[in-house]
Amino acid sequence: MNKIISVWKKMNLIRKIGIGVVLGVLLGLIAPKITVIALFGSLFVGALKAIAPLLVLTLVAHALSQAPAGQKSNMRTVICLYLFGTFAAAFIAVGASYLFPIKLVLSTTTTTDITPPQGIAEVFQDLLLKVVDNPINALATANYIGVLTWAAVFGLAFRHASKTTKDLLQSTAEVISKVVGWIIGLAPFGIMGLVFDTIANNGLTALKDYGLLLLLLVGSMIFVALVVNPLIAFLVMKKNPYPLVFECLRVSGVTAFFTRSSAANIPVNMQLCKRLGVDPDTYSVSIPLGATINMAGAAITINILTMAAVHTLGISVDFSSALLLSVVASLSAAGASGVAGGSLLLIPVACSLFVVPYVV
């Protein structure tokens, strides 16, 4: 028994999740009436929902409070490229969802009371009201747009605080990130419960659309990595970007894939920049900053899963709303930085634009 526990601890999270998926499918087919297994999924999702608002508030506030002022002039270009790259990825995700719309099987029956917003004006009005929500109420009701807004305000205010106060904010962010890490560590059991619930209630056919959803996610990310990012690099460098792109993917991409955390990948990226001869004064700031605001993968995940929910519920999305969704996803993706799988916690931010019920 101890040997099994030891092997389990040494196994990476992706393999554990894979085992959880397989067990969920098998148990859903063999013993669909043991509904207590589905409780693992409910507890896992509940824990994520509970910690997510605090996670967003502390990480964004801490990132903004630590952002140094008066950097070299080329940092403006770097920041603009970060923001443009994230927005482009978000917009491509929306376009991919239009081309390949996916509808998912939901276990909830609360979709009949949905009142979709009537165009961009109503969406924008609702967005503004969420922005000025009471910060305590925003945390309690999981109003992520309000949480992001107040996190940005507090973060800017904390720039002028004492070092002791900033250290306290950093420690708070680290503690909450640690708690999130513990919850994410339980993902194999939670996903096993979620898969079991899906299979037990809907059968194997329910996995078809989730497989298509995964293909759409991966395809969009590959397109951004091999087409959009090289195009941006070409416009800046005026030369073939692919040798640099493939080198970065080889060194940094593999680590990023298995850690699923931009913060965890910072040391790898800094070593790569040093080896490539990049100015230390630039990459010492641009790499940590990019781990916060250059969140193309998170933006893709947020938008594709949001559009899947929207298509499932039959809500129409016009071009203006899609554009606003891309902007909101780009901004909210910053809240996913530093946490493995953190983008999944930010999906309600985008879904709230279209009055998608939180239970979905």
Curated annotation (Swiss-Prot):
Keywords: Amino-acid transport, Cell membrane, Membrane, Symport, Transmembrane, Transmembrane helix, Transport
SUPFAM superfamilies: Proton glutamate symport protein
One of the GO BP terms on file: serine transport
Membrane topology of the entry: Multi-pass membrane protein
Keyword Flavoprotein among record annotations: no
Catalysed conversion reaction: L-serine(in) + Na(+)(in) = L-serine(out) + Na(+)(out); L-threonine(in) + Na(+)(in) = L-threonine(out) + Na(+)(out)
Claim: Transmembrane helix is one of the keywords in the record: yes
Primary localisation category: membrane
UniProt subcellular location: Cell membrane
InterPro entries per record: Na-dicarboxylate_symporter, Na:dicarbo_symporter_sf, Ser_Thr_transp_SstT
Residues passing through the membrane, by range: 17-37, 40-60, 78-98, 138-158, 179-199, 212-232, 295-315, 316-336, 339-359
Recorded family membership: Belongs to the dicarboxylate/amino acid:cation symporter (DAACS) (TC 2.A.23) family.
Function: Involved in the import of serine and threonine into the cell, with the concomitant import of sodium (symport system).
Protein name: Serine/threonine transporter SstT
Biological classification of the source: Bacteria, Bacillati, Bacillota, Bacilli, Lactobacillales
